[in-house]
Each structure stands twice: as C-alpha cells, then as structure tokens.
Amino acid sequence: MDTCISGISHSGRPRESMLAQEAFGMSELIIGTECGGSDPTSGLASNVLIGEISDRMAEIGGTSILSETTEFIGAEHILAKRGKDERVSQRIYQIVHDYENAIRLVGHDVREGNPSPGNMEGGLTTLEEKSLGCIHKGGHAPVNEVYDYAKQVDKNMGLVIMDTPGNDPSSVAGM
C-alpha cells in the first residue's frame, strides 16, 4: 500500500516542475492564430484583439502565424496588398486559388455552405464577411512570408501565413 501511495504522490506532481526552465526573450516566441465560431462580433472584437497581439508580436520581433487559407477567400486581395514583396503577394493569391480549385475538382463550390448555418444564425450573411473577420487576426503588419502546411516557421518573422485547411484541428496541427 505504501508503494501505491508513493507512486500516486509522485505522479501527482506537475510535469512542469520536472522540466528544466529556460528564460527566453519575447522575440523568440511564435504564436499561431485560429478562428473559433464566426459571428459578427468576431471581426469587431475577438479577432481584432488577436490582431493587436499579432501586431505587437511583429513589433517586438516575434512571429505570428495567420492560418486557415479557406477563410481568406473573398479577402485575399487585402492580405496580398500587405505582402512584403510581389513574391509574397502572389503566393497569397496562389494558395487561395489552389484551395478553390481543389474544392471545385471534387464537385463543390466553397461558397456553397459558407457562411455556415451557424455563422448565419450569428448574423453573418456572406463568405466575404466571414473572411474579413478572419483576416483581422493578422492585425495590420506586413505579411513577410507564406509557409506550406506544417513547415517549420522561422523565428523573428513578424506576421506570416501558413497555408492550412479551415478545419480547426487540422489547421492547429499544421502550425
């Protein structure tokens, strides 16, 4: 019995206390952003706040990842204008175009079912409204790079985009 109690006591300790802690500067931090349920308040409040955090990360030399390529459809031109150069701008257009084509190839149109019934119940009326809310998570900083899905993101990049699906678990797994 004493062995069981000792084992329970040992396993009950937080794992964090067993790991070596190491200080690091905020510029070393990489954050990933993700949408929750979209409604009109997303683009007015929560995503705007995330965008302010994203801008702050860029200012201090950190990295913020804007994800969910399918959520850019209808607002990609706004992101492309923020590309640091023509290559990045064209890459933004390309990843959105590729998603739209992939969806068409299987006989669907991304605009069908978007916004979703839940989005519409929340007050969104168009895919573009949903996308405008999504891109607020990227704040106002220039887009410095576009990464393929699940590629390692460099530190000290400011705002970057990762080409991920709109499905939350898949998007988060890629980041």
Regions of interest found by a model, annotated:
Residues A20-I30:
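Glycine-rich phosphate/diphosphate-binding loops that line cofactor/substrate pockets in enzymes
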Residues S9-R13:
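A short helix-breaking turn/cap at a secondary-structure junction
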Residues E28, T33, D39-M175:
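Anaerobic metallocofactor- and corrinoid-dependent redox/one-carbon enzyme cores
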Residues D2-G7:
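Glycine-rich phosphate-binding loops that contact phosphosugars or nucleotide phosphates
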